[in-house]
């Protein structure tokens, strides 16, 4: 899994039938020190994440099975909203201090 920040949404009125009702988010990936990387991806949202929240992203075949246990044509899915991230006893992110 990877860590990313929600930086936007994608709206699509015409899509593959199995994607009906799926919410899509624009994500910006983060580096090991919590810095924002110039890497973006669109992911299906399974947890109701909002703007600027840090999230865990599952990719590949695991992401395709997360939504209702069926194969859907997605490459990435948001599977958790992060409360805190720390590394080497240093707090990189806390949702509590962000809001």
Curated annotation (Swiss-Prot):
Domain of life: Bacteria
Sorted UniProt keywords: Bacterial microcompartment, Carbon dioxide fixation, Carboxysome, Photosynthesis
Molecular function GO terms recorded: structural constituent of carboxysome shell
Record-linked CDD domains: EutN_CcmL
Cited Pfam families: EutN_CcmL (PF03319)
UniProt xrefs under InterPro entries: CcmL (IPR046387), EutN_CcmL (IPR004992), EutN_CcmL_sf (IPR036677)
Main subcellular location: other
Gene Ontology biological process terms from the UniProt entry: carbon fixation; photosynthesis
Known function: Probably forms vertices in the carboxysome, a polyhedral inclusion where RuBisCO (ribulose bisphosphate carboxylase, rbcL-rbcS) is sequestered. Has been modeled to induce curvature upon insertion into an otherwise flat hexagonal molecular layer of CcmK subunits.
Family: Belongs to the CcmL/EutN family. CcmL subfamily.
Official protein name in the record: Carboxysome shell vertex protein CcmL
The species this protein was found in: Thermosynechococcus vestitus (strain NIES-2133 / IAM M-273 / BP-1)
Designated gene of the protein: ccmL
